[in-house]
Structure formats: structure tokens, C-alpha cells
């Protein structure tokens, strides 16, 4: 199995409801290690930059408004097949379709406020990690 790193966001809705610890517990219980984490309140410019690939889509303005509505947690997770493992823990993007026991089934209210984001591939994970973290901020977990 390949040890990978992936990028994760706990979105404003889940932060506001004090679900950070419960979500971190899900990550760690699944064998993912948190190698970097910080709380941020995104500016409009930061949110627009992060979600630039969606800038022509109809939901872009609402997405930027939501992601700037309160603090978020950004973290880098490391583990075996981390990208896929993290996405499985998150569940379907629409919480109404998410399997019971997944983060979105348990903590999200709607497809628009769906508690968390996870990278969809190694390439996007590398890009998203670099957007929020310098190499020096990543702390390998050797113990």
C-alpha cells in the first residue's frame, strides 16, 4: 500500500457546530495521521483562488460566500491510500446520499453546507496542500 498525503477542509458549518474533534477522531480512527493543521477565516480572495476551477459555474458566488462565512480548519492527512481513504470517510458530496456513519451523513445539513472537503486525486492534493501550507509546516509522523 502507498503512503500518501491528502488535503482536507472542515468547512464553516461543521466548525460552527463544534464538530472539529469528532471529525479528527474519524480521521485518526481510520488510520490517517494529521501532519499539519490550522484554523483560518478565508478572505474572499483566498476562497476565489482556492476554488478558481469552479469560477464559471453557477454556484461559485454562493460557494465563496459560504467558505468565507466563518472559520475553517485546513489539514493535511497522511496514510495508506490517503486520498481514497479520506473520501470514503467523508461520504458522498450530497449528505442525503452519504452512507450512514460517514462525516457528511453525520455532520452535514445539505449539499451546499456539507461539512468537509477532500482532495479527489494526488495531483489536486499536492496543489491544495501547497495553497495553504509551506513545506516547513508539514510535520512527518515517524512515531
Curated annotation (Swiss-Prot):
Name under which the protein is recorded: Nucleoside diphosphate kinase
Pfam families linked: NDK (PF00334)
PROSITE patterns, per database record: NDPK, NDPK_LIKE
Keywords annotated in UniProt: ATP-binding, Cytoplasm, Kinase, Magnesium, Metal-binding, Nucleotide metabolism, Nucleotide-binding, Phosphoprotein, Transferase
KW Transport (keyword) present: no
Molecular function terms from GO: ATP binding; metal ion binding; nucleoside diphosphate kinase activity
This protein's GO CC annotations: cytoplasm
EC number: 2.7.4.6
Family classification: Belongs to the NDK family.
Entry-linked SMART domains: NDK
Record-linked Gene3D superfamilies: Nucleoside diphosphate kinase-like domain (3.30.70.141)
NCBIfam families linked to this entry: PRK00668.1 (NF001908)
InterPro entries, A to Z: NDK-like_dom (IPR034907), NDK-like_dom_sf (IPR036850), Nucleoside_diP_kinase (IPR001564), Nucleoside_diP_kinase_AS (IPR023005)
Keyword Transcription in annotation: no
Main location: cytoplasm
